[in-house]
């Protein structure tokens, strides 16, 4: 819960905040499930399975929230995310209200869809600096999802969830929870201690960073683009790069956005295209972030490409 809250603070000003809220909700649900099991408030294996399915449904919401994180529809998209969570948890609701005492009847398609969504969430960040964190979270999610994976025996849904503290299911649950928490905390610590872009912060304001950024595409576009890549993952940043590069090619700008940052070519003394390129790049970025966020993640003024190898060439683009 702490890591999810920290993620929400770090993502403020972006459309990734709802994903952090969903992650916090999933953490609360898992804490409630764990508390009920520890206090002995729930004894029925079917009730354990229903609670776990609700936790799993909520844990998949952050990935879906990120896939729709573009303004202006990102707010309405949360209703779709909530509907998905309800549909995934429907077998638990049905078993509890309609057939009390029976195991949730999870359809085979849902058993395949849930781990597929976990893999999609991992792939979205696999090529970013948060790749190791995403891998830890994905493995932990699969362990928590284990009773509802394809080909899982129905007995495994009730047995491990209701067994003793040293049972195979309890150990798997504990390991899964630890991996998810570790991955989330690692991502939060990495974002604070090792940001993708040296933040301009007070130094940038003191030296007129806003004015410098107007003349420097590396500061105005490359820096925020890399920071957004670490926040939203590959899906949207590659789309931003594709749109920017299409406009750049049409208008003859000697620059291209790659997954590793902004590549600039041509005559270094020719700045006639800078203002238009910055305006176009910022327009694309504003679909996901606020102006204040853009200012916070611009590179410090006069920071050369040689001092920022991750923004300058090169790397493979889309």
Indicate where each model-derived feature is located.
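Alpha-solenoid helical-repeat scaffolds
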Residues: 53, 109, 129-132, 211-215, ...
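Polytopic alpha-helical membrane-helix bundles and their juxtamembrane interface segments
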Residues: 164, 174, 235-238
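Membrane-interfacial segments at transmembrane helix termini in multi-pass membrane proteins
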Residues: 182-212
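Soluble, non-transmembrane domains of integral membrane proteins
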Residues: 200-318
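Alpha-helical transmembrane segments of multi-pass integral membrane proteins
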Residues: 22-29, 77-92, 136-147, 217-219, ...
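Membrane-anchoring hydrophobic segments
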Residues: 1-88
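Juxtamembrane segments at transmembrane-helix boundaries
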Residues: 40-44, 59-136, 148-162, 173-194
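Intrinsically disordered, low-complexity terminal tails and inter-domain linkers enriched
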Residues: 160-172, 202-209
């Amino acid at each position: 819960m702490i890591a999810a809250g920290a993620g929400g603070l770090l993502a403020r000003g972006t459309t990734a905040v709802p994903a952090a809220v969903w992650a916090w909700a999933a953490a609360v649900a898992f804490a409630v499930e764990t508390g009920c099991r520890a206090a002995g408030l729930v004894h029925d294996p079917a009730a354990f399975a229903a609670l776990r399915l609700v936790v799993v449904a909520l844990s998949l919401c952050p990935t879906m929230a990120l896939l729709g994180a573009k303004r202006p529809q990102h707010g309405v998209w949360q209703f779709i995310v909530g509907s998905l969570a309800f549909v995934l948890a429907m077998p638990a609701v049905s078993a509890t209200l309609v057939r009390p005492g029976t195991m949730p009847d999870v359809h085979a398609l849902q058993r395949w869809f849930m781990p597929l969504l976990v893999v999609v969430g991992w792939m979205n960040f696999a090529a970013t600096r948060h790749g190791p964190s995403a891998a830890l979270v994905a493995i932990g999610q699969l362990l928590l999802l284990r009773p509802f994976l394809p080909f899982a025996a129905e007995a495994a849904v009730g047995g491990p969830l209701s067994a003793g503290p040293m049972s195979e299911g309890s150990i798997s649950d504990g390991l899964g929870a630890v991996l998810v928490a570790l991955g989330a905390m690692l991502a939060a610590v990495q974002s604070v201690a090792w940001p993708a872009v040296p933040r301009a912060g007070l130094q940038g304001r003191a030296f007129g960073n806003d004015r410098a950024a107007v003349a420097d595409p590396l500061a105005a576009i490359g820096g925020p683009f890399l920071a957004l890549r670490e926040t939203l993952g590959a899906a949207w940043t590659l789309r931003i790069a594709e749109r920017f590069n299409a406009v750049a090619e049409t208008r003859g700008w000697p620059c291209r956005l790659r997954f590793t940052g902004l590549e600039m070519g041509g005559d270094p003394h020719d700045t006639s295209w800078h203002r238009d390129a910055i305006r176009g790049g910022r327009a694309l970025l504003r679909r996901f972030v606020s102006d204040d966020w853009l200012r916070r993640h611009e590179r410090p003024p006069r920071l050369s490409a040689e001092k920022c190898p991750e923004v300058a060439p090169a790397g493979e683009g889309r």
